[in-house]
Amino acid sequence: MSIFDWFAKQEKSEPPIQQQQKEREIADGLWTKCVACTALTYTKDLQANQLVCTECGHHFRVESSERIAQLMDKNTWKPLNDHLTPTDPLKFCDRKPYSDRIKDTQEKTGLVDAVQTGTGLIDGLPLALGVMDFRFMGGSMGSVVGEKLCRLIEYATQERLPVVIVCASGGARMQEGMLSLMQMAKISGALERHRNAKLLYIPVLTHPTTGGVTASFAMLGDLIIAEPNATIGFAGRRVIEQTLREKLPDGFQTSEYLLKHGFVDAIVSRTQLKKTLAQLISIHQPFFPVLPPLNVREKHHHHHSEEVVLKMDGKEE
């Protein structure tokens, strides 16, 4: 065997170091490989960094329970309406019955539906929070998701709380037909009443936020925050290109593209999200306990003016 044949054999039997790293088996979840930069990170370090890659800043998807733990102060979370569960009014069946799909997804994820709602404290400030979970049928918005979010917003309006909804969804749930689509208007109506009460609403757009969620409550915030490099849009890129027969620009439907064109107000890293939300709420919140309703202020001003006139009349006498 010549030296050239020997080297050729070694190249076939032993892949390069980079290839070995890519194909390395990650045993028992001890290490996690970044899907963006392929760097291997100790899983506990990744979790301590809120599932943000320490090498490239890639944001991994986060389960709703973990997101709640990241945002809410410890032992302050109180779930709302967690007893609501989806039904199958249309007896819908695609590859399998919708009722079976619900049960299978509930067993797999441990969730009742694609959103968790509740109240708690964020850096000591009261907050009504909704967190969508993409693991549950792609975070799709059905009747239960719409009802839970609507009740959350109505409760926040009644109790004068700011609302934050963390969005992660493929859109409306097709298995529920019109019952799913009507949730867009239903939630939007609840948010309008919340806005009329001069209360703060902030949606946080994560990867991905698409479809009917984008077309409704995801874009109705007083301030709209997005995570870095999140896919945000209505229809998919391929669908738009095939419909328009045009090539879309690079980076289209990313949070950076939307920020550049004025559709979102800020891109905030997950590691800074709690701090940022708390600061925004603290800026907005003090105006409500300090300032009474407008009609009360007007009465107070009128009464104060009368007192001044009486005192001036007394001095003149």
UniProtKB/Swiss-Prot annotation:
ATP-binding listed as a keyword: yes
Protein EC: 2.1.3.15
ZnF (C4-type) residues: 34-56
Binding site for Zn(2+): C34, C37, C53, C56
Protein localization: Cytoplasm
GO molecular function: acetyl-CoA carboxylase activity; ATP binding; carboxyl- or carbamoyltransferase activity; zinc ion binding
One Pfam family from the record: Carboxyl_trans
Description of how the protein assembles with itself and partners: Acetyl-CoA carboxylase is a heterohexamer composed of biotin carboxyl carrier protein (AccB), biotin carboxylase (AccC) and two subunits each of ACCase subunit alpha (AccA) and ACCase subunit beta (AccD).
Family label: Belongs to the AccD/PCCB family.
Protein name: Acetyl-coenzyme A carboxylase carboxyl transferase subunit beta
Gene giving rise to this polypeptide: accD
